[in-house]
Amino acid sequence: MACLSPSQLKKFQEDGFLLLEGFFTADECVVMQQRIGEIVAEMDVPLHCRTEFSTQEDEQLQTQGNTDYFLSSGDKIRFFFEKGVFDEKGNFLVPPEKSINKIGHALHAHDPVFRSITHSPKVQALVRSLGLQIPVVVQSMYIFKQPHFGGEVSPHQDATFLYTEPLGRVLGLWIATEDAMLENGCLWFIPGSHTSGVSRRMIRAPSDSGPGTSFLGSEPAWDNNLFVPLPVRRGGLVLIHGEVVHKSEQNLSDHSRQAYTFHLMEAAGTVWSPGNWLQPTTELPFPPLYI
């Protein structure tokens, strides 16, 4: 049954995250992995667009936050790479398929496999059980968490980057297409941290001032002792409240930790911030989840 039980809904409301084991089958995960392998095999990224992805604030502003390749990726399928995988000329130092940090941000719109997963009847039933009336899909990503050097994701709130008024209207759905364990960089959460508001916002520069972003506010020094790990077996789905604090460590194991994730916004009575880096476009307005 895809709908949440009253006890599951209560736990999500209390913690700001919830694991649903076995939400997707192993076969569905294989289909996603096979399709992403095909997309990677066809990858052709010009030298000047080879952007290393980071969640560290200073590196964000120096790399993807100030490049049009990132800022214009909201309605496209684009590739972002781990740190240290290019030489000074932009050539790969490791096999290209092992260099990718993530693919974003519109797999849900442009690829039939990921569109089918995103809009699957069980996802729609799950989201309905959370009470969302007019959910729209704002972005999607396939995350690789490569073995041996898959980068850490520093503590953050999704609403820092996907801000709405009022708050509390963004929901992440994170699907483990491979086992996500302590050894290979599973997610960590601070339970209940979604009730304290947003401490930092990433703001896009006005269009007439050129591409770029800046941050308003600062990330608190989160107490590491407050984080709890959330290992997830392949096929598990994690619901993530837009304001819950979460992170993941670097993957130093021999195994990747692949996942498909997408974010929804409750469009009813909600204003999507015009300052967000990601904006709907004429080519791709935020598509409704319910079809």
UniProtKB/Swiss-Prot annotation:
Chloroplast keyword on record = no
Enzyme class, broadest EC rank: oxidoreductase
InterPro entries for this protein: Phytyl_CoA_dOase-like
* Source organism (scientific name): Rattus norvegicus
- Write the protein's name: Phytanoyl-CoA dioxygenase domain-containing protein 1
**In the record, which residues are listed under signal peptide?**
none
Q: Which UniProt keywords apply?
A: Dioxygenase, Iron, Metal-binding, Oxidoreductase, Phosphoprotein
* Binding-site residues for Fe cation, renumbered to this chain: 156, 158, 246
Which cofactor(s) does the record list?
Answer: Fe cation
Domain of life here? Eukaryota
